[in-house]
From Swiss-Prot:
GO terms for biological process: endothelin receptor signaling pathway; G protein-coupled receptor signaling pathway; vascular endothelial growth factor signaling pathway. Disulfide bonds: none annotated. Prominently expressed in brain and heart tissues. Weakly expressed in aorta, adrenal gland, and lung tissues. Keywords: Cell membrane, Membrane, Transmembrane, Transmembrane helix. It is found in: Cell membrane. Residues 1-69 are extracellular. One of its GO terms (molecular function) is endothelin receptor activity. The lineage of its organism: Eukaryota, Metazoa, Chordata, Craniata, Vertebrata. It comes from Rattus norvegicus. This is Dual endothelin-1/VEGF signal peptide receptor. Signal peptide: none annotated. Changing W65G: Abolishes binding with EDN1. Affects binding with angiotensin-2 peptide. The gene is Fbxw7-as1. In the Dahl salt-resistant strain, acts as a dual receptor for both endothelin-1 and the signal sequence of vascular endothelial growth factor A and does not act as a receptor for angiotensin-2. Does not bind the VEGFA mature protein. In the Dahl salt-sensitive strain, acts as a dual endothelin-1/angiotensin-2 receptor that is functionally coupled to a calcium-mobilizing transduction system, responding equivalently to both endothelin-1/EDN1 and angiotensin-2 peptides in a highly specific manner. May play a role in angiogenesis with a significant role in cardiovascular and neural development. Its main location: membrane.
Amino acid sequence: MSTFYVTAVPKSHSSLPKCQAMMSRTLLTGMAMYLDSSHAGAASMQVSWPPLLTSLGSKEMKSRWNWGSITCIMCFTCVGSQLSMSSSKASNFSGPLQLYQRGIGHITNPYRRPPAPAWPCSSSGTT
């Protein structure tokens, strides 16, 4: 059970010493408060404590954490898909490009361009 201390100052008696109030985190939602000293003006005391925060902190920190986690998930998704594609062999796919690269594209692709003629070599001995 975690507790923290809150400084309380009487509303009408600012010259009185500050009272220490101990508030239990488990009872915070019910606003239960335990004072370690009793004064005549205890009913009119103003108690101030830091705003109620979750484990992540303020709203700005939650927003930054959400943005960072979304960015991280997107990066891992991108990198994972790239690694998956690079580890796969082209022979595992059977699309038209892979068939053409394996040399059997002329069977399935009637619009294949004929091979270009070879350039004449000047070292062939003919003039």
